[in-house]
């Protein structure tokens, strides 16, 4: 569970209503794969990931990034039950995909950076602090099955 004040919940959901999930999802996942290239091993079926340009232009990266942010959107609707919301994804990533749970934290941090880049001055320190709490909560929920 993530502990957000009513004001923080309003900040998070207010900004999220302006997020273009298609674009931001692809950008966030793409940046994760570029900045942390060892994460590419989980995406062998995505084709050419040989350069930053190839990753950022890859249709499968963009599509999966959208899928990731669609799940994140569900989490935002259930901030008081992130563990339950992400239970099946946690199990999938742990038992079948064997994803290092640290990658969830990395992706959350990249997402915060992408949001800051996209929203500029609107992404105030208060917005960043609220989103940082959320991405930590989501990463913790996704890592739950690993414990």
From Swiss-Prot:
Modified residues (N-acetylvaline): 2
CDD domains for this protein: Hb-beta-like
Residue numbers bearing the Phosphothreonine modification: 13
GO CC term, one of those recorded: hemoglobin complex
Record-linked PROSITE patterns: GLOBIN
Pfam families on file: Globin (PF00042)
Database matches in Gene3D superfamilies: Globins (1.10.490.10)
Binding, heme b: 64, 93
Family (UniProt): Belongs to the globin family.
Described purpose of this protein according to its UniProt entry: Involved in oxygen transport from the lung to the various peripheral tissues.
Name of this chain's protein: Hemoglobin subunit beta
Organism per entry: Rhinolophus ferrumequinum (Greater horseshoe bat)
């Amino acid at each position: 569970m993530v502990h957000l004040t009513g004001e923080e919940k309003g900040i998070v959901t207010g900004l999220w209503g302006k997020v273009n999930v298609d674009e931001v999802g692809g950008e966030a996942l793409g940046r994760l794969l570029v900045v942390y290239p060892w994460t590419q091993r989980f995406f062998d079926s995505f084709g050419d990931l040989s350069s930053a340009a190839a990753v950022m232009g890859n249709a499968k990266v963009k599509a999966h990034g959208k899928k990731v942010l669609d799940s994140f959107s569900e989490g935002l609707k259930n901030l008081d039950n992130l563990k339950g919301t992400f239970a099946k994804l946690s199990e999938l990533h742990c038992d079948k995909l064997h994803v290092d749970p640290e990658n969830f934290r990395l992706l959350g941090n990249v997402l915060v950076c992408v949001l800051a880049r996209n929203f500029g001055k609107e992404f105030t320190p208060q917005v960043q602090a609220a989103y940082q709490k959320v991405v930590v909560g989501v990463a913790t929920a996704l890592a739950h099955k690993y414990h």
